[in-house]
Amino acid sequence: MFSWLKGRRSKDTLKDRLELVLAYDRAQIPPGKVDALRNDLLEVVKRYFPAGSSNVEVEQRGDQVVLMASIALDEGIENPGRRER
Protein backbone atom coordinates (compact mmCIF):
# COMPACT_ATOMS: atom_id res chain seq x y z
CA MET A 1 0.00 0.00 0.00
CA PHE A 2 2.71 2.49 0.96
CA SER A 3 5.49 0.98 -1.14
CA TRP A 4 6.94 4.43 -1.83
CA LEU A 5 7.93 4.59 1.85
CA LYS A 6 10.17 1.54 1.45
CA GLY A 7 12.34 3.10 -1.24
CA ARG A 8 15.09 5.58 -0.83
CA ARG A 9 13.96 9.05 0.17
CA SER A 10 14.30 11.69 -2.51
CA LYS A 11 16.21 14.02 -0.19
CA ASP A 12 18.86 11.30 0.28
CA THR A 13 19.13 10.78 -3.47
CA LEU A 14 19.39 14.52 -4.02
CA LYS A 15 22.08 14.80 -1.34
CA ASP A 16 24.15 12.03 -2.96
CA ARG A 17 23.85 13.64 -6.39
CA LEU A 18 24.88 17.02 -5.01
CA GLU A 19 27.93 15.49 -3.29
CA LEU A 20 28.91 13.86 -6.58
CA VAL A 21 28.54 17.12 -8.51
CA LEU A 22 30.63 18.96 -5.90
CA ALA A 23 33.36 16.29 -6.01
CA TYR A 24 33.50 16.53 -9.83
CA ASP A 25 33.65 20.32 -9.59
CA ARG A 26 36.45 20.29 -7.00
CA ALA A 27 38.43 17.82 -9.10
CA GLN A 28 37.83 20.02 -12.17
CA ILE A 29 36.49 17.05 -14.14
CA PRO A 30 34.65 18.21 -17.26
CA PRO A 31 31.21 16.76 -18.02
CA GLY A 32 31.40 13.41 -19.78
CA LYS A 33 35.00 12.72 -18.76
CA VAL A 34 34.05 10.13 -16.11
CA ASP A 35 31.77 8.33 -18.59
CA ALA A 36 34.59 8.22 -21.14
CA LEU A 37 36.97 6.90 -18.48
CA ARG A 38 34.44 4.24 -17.44
CA ASN A 39 34.15 3.04 -21.05
CA ASP A 40 37.93 3.00 -21.55
CA LEU A 41 38.54 1.07 -18.32
CA LEU A 42 35.93 -1.53 -19.19
CA GLU A 43 37.39 -1.94 -22.68
CA VAL A 44 40.90 -2.54 -21.30
CA VAL A 45 39.71 -4.99 -18.62
CA LYS A 46 37.74 -6.94 -21.24
CA ARG A 47 41.01 -7.57 -23.10
CA TYR A 48 42.17 -9.71 -20.17
CA PHE A 49 38.99 -10.94 -18.46
CA PRO A 50 35.36 -11.47 -19.36
CA ALA A 51 33.80 -8.46 -17.67
CA GLY A 52 30.32 -7.10 -17.19
CA SER A 53 29.30 -3.69 -15.98
CA SER A 54 31.52 -1.06 -14.43
CA ASN A 55 31.04 1.72 -11.95
CA VAL A 56 33.41 4.68 -11.65
CA GLU A 57 32.95 7.14 -8.81
CA VAL A 58 34.68 10.31 -7.72
CA GLU A 59 34.68 11.17 -4.02
CA GLN A 60 36.04 13.96 -1.89
CA ARG A 61 38.05 12.61 1.07
CA GLY A 62 39.41 15.46 3.08
CA ASP A 63 41.80 17.36 0.83
CA GLN A 64 41.97 14.60 -1.78
CA VAL A 65 39.71 13.64 -4.65
CA VAL A 66 39.55 9.85 -5.01
CA LEU A 67 38.62 7.97 -8.19
CA MET A 68 37.26 4.46 -7.56
CA ALA A 69 36.47 1.86 -10.20
CA SER A 70 34.42 -1.26 -9.59
CA ILE A 71 34.24 -3.70 -12.50
CA ALA A 72 32.22 -6.91 -12.27
CA LEU A 73 34.08 -9.90 -13.73
CA ASP A 74 31.94 -12.61 -15.31
CA GLU A 75 32.02 -16.09 -13.82
CA GLY A 76 33.99 -18.86 -15.42
CA ILE A 77 37.42 -17.27 -15.60
CA GLU A 78 39.65 -20.24 -16.43
CA ASN A 79 42.98 -18.53 -16.97
CA PRO A 80 43.44 -15.11 -15.39
CA GLY A 81 46.50 -14.50 -17.57
CA ARG A 82 46.53 -12.41 -20.71
CA ARG A 83 44.18 -13.55 -23.46
CA GLU A 84 45.52 -13.86 -26.97
CA ARG A 85 44.07 -11.43 -29.47
Swiss-Prot record:
Keywords: Cell cycle, Cell division. One of its GO terms (biological process) is regulation of division septum assembly. Coiled coil: none annotated. It comes from the Bacteria. InterPro entries: MinE (IPR005527), MinE_sf (IPR036707). Belongs to the MinE family. Prevents the cell division inhibition by proteins MinC and MinD at internal division sites while permitting inhibition at polar sites. This ensures cell division at the proper site by restricting the formation of a division septum at the midpoint of the long axis of the cell. This is Cell division topological specificity factor. It comes from Deinococcus geothermalis (strain DSM 11300 / CIP 105573 / AG-3a). The lineage of its organism: Bacteria, Thermotogati, Deinococcota, Deinococci, Deinococcales.
